[in-house]
């Protein structure tokens, strides 16, 4: 039930090859979160669909939140605070998008630009709000379970520029009549220049962009499964195994004593069919 930890009346999670889907029901309100990675662009969409099964009009406030790094996982793990010092943010009001870039420390370092935007299908109320300062969003001594910007009902500060700990946060307020559903798609896109990232923002700032990404993701998933000759159940097992290989989960690792006993010279690998001619 992340991030709030509040148990709903009903909850369900479905992972498929093309998307992840989270469904929860709280009273008369049902929320569906669909997460899809675009096959054609460096873009991810998280669409929130809110349905009102009650007898009265509801006004719902939706707030996104993501912590920014714009660096490799290794660089962030080694020096997380230092890595984030070089991120600058700005807001492009005409597109309703937050932009962020990492200041290069040398001309040889490649540019990295990211953008975050929201596309609303339904009736909006109030003005869009943004935040790019993590401290202002979370508050002193708080975390994502109880951020002050959400729990206290205060507006976002619309802070941009050079911040010590950057985030992407967008807020939209929607009005949902009885028996109706409103969709809000939160897009995050990445490119190698400001011009390119603005082009991606323009491309995805449309209500049809989600359907296109969903169709392409499903099609690509079916083609991959057919090409590999595996069914969805087998693909799920392979992905779980790949996760342990890529991220080296400690729970799957033998004890240090077992690893030391397995040490030896390269000839010890030859009996296993591993050599310079047949590398891993």
Q: What annotation goes with each model-predicted range?
A:
Residues 1-280:
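Anionic coordination/interaction segments
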């Amino acid at each position: 039930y992340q991030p709030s930890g509040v148990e709903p009346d009903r909850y369900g999670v479905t992972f498929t090859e093309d998307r992840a889907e989270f469904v929860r029901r709280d009273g008369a309100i049902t929320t569906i979160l669909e997460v899809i990675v675009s096959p054609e662009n460096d873009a991810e969409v998280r669409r929130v669909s809110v349905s009102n099964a009650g007898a009265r009009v509801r006004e719902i406030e939706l707030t996104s939140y993501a912590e920014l790094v714009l660096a490799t996982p290794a660089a962030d793990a080694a020096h997380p605070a230092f890595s984030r010092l070089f991120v600058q943010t700005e807001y492009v009001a005409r597109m309703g998008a937050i932009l962020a870039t990492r200041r290069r420390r040398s001309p040889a370092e490649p540019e990295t630009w990211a953008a975050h935007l929201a596309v609303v299908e339904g009736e909006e109320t109030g003005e869009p709000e943004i935040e790019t300062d993590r401290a202002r969003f979370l508050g002193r001594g708080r975390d994502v379970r109880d951020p002050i910007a959400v729990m206290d009902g205060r507006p976002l500060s619309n802070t941009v520029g050079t911040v010590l700990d950057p985030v992407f946060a967008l807020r939209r307020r929607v009005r949902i009549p009885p028996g109706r559903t409103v969709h809000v798609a939160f897009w995050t896109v990445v490119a190698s220049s400001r011009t390119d990232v603005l082009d991606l923002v323009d491309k995805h700032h449309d209500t049809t962009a989600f359907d296109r990404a969903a169709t392409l993701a499903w099609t690509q998933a079916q083609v991959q499964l057919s090409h590999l000759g595996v069914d969805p159940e087998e693909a799920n097992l392979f992905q779980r195994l790949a996760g342990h290989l890529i991220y080296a989960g400690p729970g799957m690792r033998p004890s240090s004593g077992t690893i030391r006993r397995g040490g030896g010279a390269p000839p010890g690998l030859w009996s296993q069919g591993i050599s310079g001619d047949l590398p891993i």
